[in-house]
């Protein structure tokens, strides 16, 4: 099972069985024999896709002519993974993201679904202007642009105002600094410095 397939299985559990992403991720990482690189990649795919969930669906709706509830949940999750890689992961070649998504659709659905996934993702690659992030300061636009739940953005705006809400959302999207803490009962300063 490759990294994207593991990520898909986790997303299927999260979105169809209401599993917690962190618990499902831990279980799958322990269950599968994976390299450290694959483990990091799966973690980024799962957490990134879940975090950007509303934004990914907003983008998907721009390229699909039917209601999303008429599409198999697994295909929606394959498209979420593909869109996340194409839009938010700069180091992943767009063609690789598209081809791997098509392969997953063939394996987990049928040839028609694979063609559908291919068409959606190829159009996404060809027409990036179609999913340009909204630039306004309305709650719904800010939620899409900054990948935050709408209810949280509304609460930020109500509590702190629009400008502070934007800064809060942007701050939430930064990586936390690495902080190391030692247990002074088990280690001494000399040992830690080496």
Language model region names:
Residues 1-194:
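Class I Rossmann-like S-adenosyl-L-methionine
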